[in-house]
Amino acid sequence: MAKKVALAYSGGLDTSVCIPILKEKYGYDEVVTISVDVGQPEEEIKRADAKAEKISNKHYTIDAKEEFVKDYVFPLIKANGSYEGYVMGTSIARPLIAKKVVEAARKEGAVALAHGCTGKGNDQLRFEAVFRQTDMDVIAPMREMNLTREWEIDYAKEHGIPVEVTKSKPWSVDENIWSRSIEGGRLEDPSFVPPEEIFEWTTSPEKTPEQPRIVDIGFEAGVPVSLDGEKMSGYALVKKMNEIAGENGVGRTDMIEDRVLGLKARENYEHPAATVLLAAHADLEKLVLTRSELKFKKIVDDQWSELAYYGLVDEPLYADLNAFIDKSQERVTGTVKVRLYKGALTILSRSSPNALYSEDLVSFDSQTIDQKDSEGFAKYHGFQARMYRKVMDKQ
């Protein structure tokens, strides 16, 4: 019986060179490649399919776009998911991709699982958090052979593997419907100014439309369900928001990121829809949740984001946090109006049937509340600080 290994396959340089390496260096008879569609460009999927058909023994392309948005992106929105300002597009997709690879591997009777992640990044941990739940061997050629980008390019040429990257432009790009990451090459120098050519989803602000774009975003139970009153599927909504916000230059991040291993990395991201939807959701929460809920949920959201960034979505705590978050989102229903203009996002208004805000009570022109009633509260506000000052003054 053929000795099979299942490889998480993107069609990029790293995973493409893994195919001959797994045969030549590791002794596997067959390499089964699995590409998981979580919203990459259609041409990227087709390119990966065409390449895999030539160099792998068998190839799967699994459509997980709607599942990704429904089960991973929407929970991220409800949790205001962010790690050091990063919207975690790559992070949140890896567990789903890994799970789909495991499913295909079992179907094929593979004895091992492989990925093309390096030993310096986070993705190795995210994939293996899922892979190591199985009894299959886990292979990481990039890490185990300590491979460099230049070596991979030369190796690919020797084996007739077409590559899109070059030694002068060795950008590593990862895309899904939630974000696009660009790293590698000169981008690793934090003092290097990224060339405009690395951006594809977002228009440079000086080239955006001269008129602002106003969008109404409808939410139900913490999840975006409509744009300008038009209801649509989760995937379609995120895709449309990417187009609208990207055209107006919204959603670029250039940051120094603390990886799980402790290394600092320079990262460039594009995430138009994520920028807008996360901001709109957080704003709506402020309208409908109590001060205590918002304060505690911030702690929960931060812990949720860290687990998601680490790829630990099978941790019991992750499910516990989601239970609280889901309960908190039951009232997060309403509409947020945003303006997108020259790279800037502005929240214009928000409304909800569950709003805790009362225009009548808060108005300076209203006498619904007798202002004198707050005098008793004011007398004791800062009471302990006053007592402390008296004690200190006696010393």
UniProtKB/Swiss-Prot annotation:
This is Argininosuccinate synthase. Homotetramer. Its EC number is 6.3.4.5. L-citrulline binds at residues 86, 91, 122, 126, 172, 181, 257, 269. Gene3D superfamilies: Argininosuccinate synthetase, chain A, domain 2 (3.90.1260.10), HUPs (3.40.50.620). ATP binds at residues 8-16, 116. One of its GO terms (molecular function) is argininosuccinate synthase activity. It is found in: Cytoplasm. It catalyses: L-citrulline + L-aspartate + ATP = 2-(N(omega)-L-arginino)succinate + AMP + diphosphate + H(+). GO terms for biological process: argininosuccinate metabolic process; L-arginine biosynthetic process; urea cycle. Keywords: Amino-acid biosynthesis, Arginine biosynthesis, ATP-binding, Cytoplasm, Ligase, Nucleotide-binding.
